[in-house]
Amino acid sequence: MPHEKQDRDAEEIEDEGKNIILGIVSQLRPNMDLSKVTFPTFVLEPKSMLERITNFMSHPDLLLNVQKTADPEMRFLDVVRFYMSGWHIRPRGVKKPLNPILGETFTGFWKFPPSNSKDPNLQKLHGIAVYAAEQVCHHPPISAYFYLCPEYKVRIDGVVKPRSRFLGNSAASIMEGIASIKLQDLDEEYLITQPNVYARGILFGKMRLELGDHVTVRCPKTDLQADIEFKVKGFISGTYNSIAGKVKRVSTGEVLYKISGKWDSEMSVESVKTGETRPLLDVSKHDVYLVSARPLEEQGERESQRLWYKTCQAVIARDQTTATETKSAIEDRQREEAKQREIENVQWKPKYFKMIAPEEYILNFDIPNGKSDLEVLCALDEFIPIFSEVDRIAFHKFLSENTKPEDSSIHKHSRDASGDSTKGFAEHMPAPARRRRPQSTASFVTYRSDNGSVDEYHDAQLPDPNTLSKLHEEQDPAL
């Protein structure tokens, strides 16, 4: 008998939870802004939005070698494939990430190849990629993020600007904001939008998560654009998680390729010219590679995993009282800070990002020229903490041992025959750093079930509770 795929996007809410939701909904009106509505903690994912964004960088093997594809059309499809690869990574049921507070940050990194993966696609990679995000605005909420892999000359800058709306039996998160993927060796930029997120079945039926509406992937230099529809299921017909799209030449409107499939499993691409159909992506054939972060005890009080630690612990334990109390304490402190700034006539300024246009931000850091990839990473780490103390010591030791006195840059001296300037370092990173996962209940490990679906489970490797209690007491007794 064939194995029936589990419906991981649907969720049955217990009667008590349903009553809480109905009590909230009774005070709402259609199309009402939900930004100031306090949701019950049982619908929360134990992870901040700043960390949640890293899901979209969890298939680096689909991005980092893109510049080796010579044909512009095939390279464009490679970028589309990478873009479509991140949506299947999500918690079970209908969960929303924690809303970051103003000034909250999250940083992390990926070291290639991952020592805990046998995926041949990942084993071919080498080097280090870094990520940094900051909540740069609270009204409206704006999360700015940055990704860089110096070895492969790939950079991503983006903002997420969610706008929540009540739609009757559904709640919608309108995901405004644009991501820019830069392939620096080719001087190409890909501008990308996001699908909207819908929570169905708020009043009746099963609660279910759906992605919907149109997104675009556009490359001005190659004159190519993908228009992709994330289809929502109709009341009578249709299927869940389907997509349909096309790739066209912008200047002429000529359709070159058609895209179809399901964003949580298999997708294919058809050439309009030849009629040939080939796989675009099968997510079951690629390991998910989650971000690593510094140990919790090395994080600042406004870094996501440390800030929300008690709330995440309580959410996972289904302790709604503690989750609500700790979450409210953090949000109350944020409101008090806002009042104090108003009294003192102080305008908030992001710490690590700068505004380049209304509601658009990039990292306020200039990548140094003429430096090795490792020196670039060290410079970034000095600007915004990314690596652990153990890794940082290893960085500087490697640099001192591989830098000639007459040349402070190791760019010309440390590359091997493959052109790799960080491989030598990455292979000798301290063993704990190789396998380190974010040491917080907000982190997850990945498990692939027999039916091919990807589930996220809480990482059992937690920091010492006594250390954490001390950290939080020092941060704020109320938290």
UniProtKB/Swiss-Prot annotation:
Residue stretches of biased makeup (Basic and acidic residues): 404-418, 470-479
Keyword terms: Cytoplasm, Lipid transport, Lipid-binding, Nucleus, Phosphoprotein, Transport
A GO molecular function held by the record: sterol transfer activity
Phosphoserine PTM positions: S328, S408, S409, S421
Ranges for region Disordered: 404-479
Compositionally skewed regions (Polar residues) per UniProt: 439-452
InterPro entries attached to this UniProt entry: OSBP_sf, Oxysterol-bd, Oxysterol-bd_CS
Record Gene3D superfamilies: 1.10.287.2720, 2.40.160.120, 3.30.70.3490
SUPFAM superfamilies: Oxysterol-binding protein-like
Entry GO CC: cortical endoplasmic reticulum; cytosol; membrane; nucleus
Sequence similarity: Belongs to the OSBP family.
UniProt protein name: Oxysterol-binding protein homolog C23B6.01c
Species assigned in the record: Schizosaccharomyces pombe (strain 972 / ATCC 24843)
Lineage per the UniProt record: Eukaryota, Fungi, Dikarya, Ascomycota, Taphrinomycotina
